[in-house]
């Protein structure tokens, strides 16, 4: 016959020994080799933000205000033509995003449009761009527990958010991406574009870890978004 009081003492002692481990798993973000923060996993935004200026107080220049007035989500949203979202809008898409860390790069694979964003850790921006792109050229480096990302080289086709905030080819986006805790990722943006805005402005997005999730196939055809299974 088992000694139940002794069993209870052993189980209780084991539980106490596990408390610091469990707390560490929750409070301290994981690291990869070389003590670089581990951002990998499938993430999804915690709160959808259609507009980065919901109160309508964006610091437009006259050019920026005129471009914003022309924006119509039902007519000329670039995404209606199945074009890439651009940055920062890609980071505000309300669909899962998977992050991979490989030598020299951080890769972000967004289910929306099945778009791949590359953040280069092993080079600088070119002195001149052969062509300007939707998502620009992203260069990253680690500063403590944050990934600092500098992105330039944009074309002027995309919107900054889902309601039509415009930008020019002078757009410069700076991000500080940090894993706040095991289940939370935070991205702080600074937006600079002297043609569209009278001053730099900031935005923030929070993401939550989605264990067990996978990125699904996404089809954009004839201006209609079709989602396939998760």
What is each of the regions a protein language model found here?
Residues 10-21:
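Bacterial N-terminal signal peptides
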Residues 2-3, 21-230:
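PEST-like low-complexity, intrinsically disordered acidic/proline/serine-rich tracts
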Residues 3-10:
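N-terminal Sec-pathway targeting helices
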């Amino acid at each position: 016959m088992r000694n139940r009081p002794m069993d209870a003492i052993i189980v209780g002692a084991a539980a106490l020994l596990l408390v610091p481990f469990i707390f560490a798993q929750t409070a301290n973000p994981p690291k990869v080799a070389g003590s670089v923060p581990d951002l990998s996993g499938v993430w999804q935004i915690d709160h959808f933000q259609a507009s980065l200026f919901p109160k309508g107080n964006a610091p437009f220049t006259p050019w920026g205000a005129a471009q914003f007035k022309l924006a119509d989500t039902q007519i000329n949203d670039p995404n209606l033509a199945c074009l890439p979202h651009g940055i920062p809008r890609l980071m505000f898409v309300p669909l899962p995003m998977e992050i991979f860390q490989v030598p020299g790069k951080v890769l972000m694979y967004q289910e929306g449009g099945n778009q791949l964003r590359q953040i280069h850790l092993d080079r600088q921006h070119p002195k001149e761009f052969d062509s300007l792109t939707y998502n620009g050229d992203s260069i990253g480096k680690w500063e403590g527990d944050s990934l600092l990302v500098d992105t330039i080289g944009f074309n002027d086709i995309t919107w900054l958010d889902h309601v039509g905030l415009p930008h020019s080819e002078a757009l410069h986006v700076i991000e500080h991406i940090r894993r706040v805790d095991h289940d939370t990722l935070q991205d702080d943006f600074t937006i600079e574009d002297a043609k569209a805005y009278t001053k730099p402005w900031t935005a923030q997005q929070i993401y939550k870890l989605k264990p067990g999730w996978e990125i699904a196939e996404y089809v954009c055809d004839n201006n209609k978004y079709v989602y396939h299974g998760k």
